[in-house]
Amino acid sequence: MLILTSNGLTSQEILDRAAPYLSGKRCALVTTASVGFKQNDKNIPRHTRELLACGASGVELFDFDEQSPAGLTAYDAALLIGGNPYYLLHSIRTHGFAQPLRELSTKGTLIGVSAGALVLTPSIAVIDAFTPEMNQHVGLTDKTGLSLCDCEILPHYSKFLTRFDRFEERAQEYERQNGVTLHRLNDGEALFIGA
């Protein structure tokens, strides 16, 4: 099961739909994308509460930069928190986590939040249209995601409409140039793939 979210399991509808896939499961809370904060990310308590509300038997912090791919296989589910999608994708590739994440998406439950969701799709290139500076210190040239689904997403849609100049126009331009349809996800929304 693959669950792509804008800001986590933040609505009752998402919690209710996710519960059957998380009940009794041991979950890894992957902090890698939260560059500079990681285990101190302010959203960790909320994500932990949400996973436990879905019946998870336990939630443990996990960092691709510090732990092994084999370690991830010990979990039934994982939630990749938001942060820097360029850094997260680079870390997944550098440390060999692509295959364990693929396996988890088919044998267990894999949840992506914002950047954590973007890396699971075919491409993170849409971020270049809005915040390319996030790639400044990473220098990622290949924006190909893990392609665990065949859709691309645009998280935090309604929030970013007022934050970025010509946001919708730029999103449509990306769609035209790349021949894709972006699934616009507002906070509190999710895509369930494989349900």
What are these regions (language model features)?
Residues 33-38, 85, 157-161:
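Short histidine/acidic/glycine/proline-rich micro-motifs that form metal-
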Residues 7, 40-43, 84, 135, ...:
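Detector for Asparagine
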Residues 3, 111-112:
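Structural detector of well-ordered beta-strand residues that form the stable sheet scaffold
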Residues 1-77, 81:
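N-terminal beta1-alpha1 cap of cysteine-dependent amidohydrolase-like domains
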Residues 35, 43, 50, 56, ...:
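Bulky hydrophobic/aromatic packing residues
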Residues 80, 89-109, 116-195:
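Active-site-adjacent pocket-lining segments in enzyme domains
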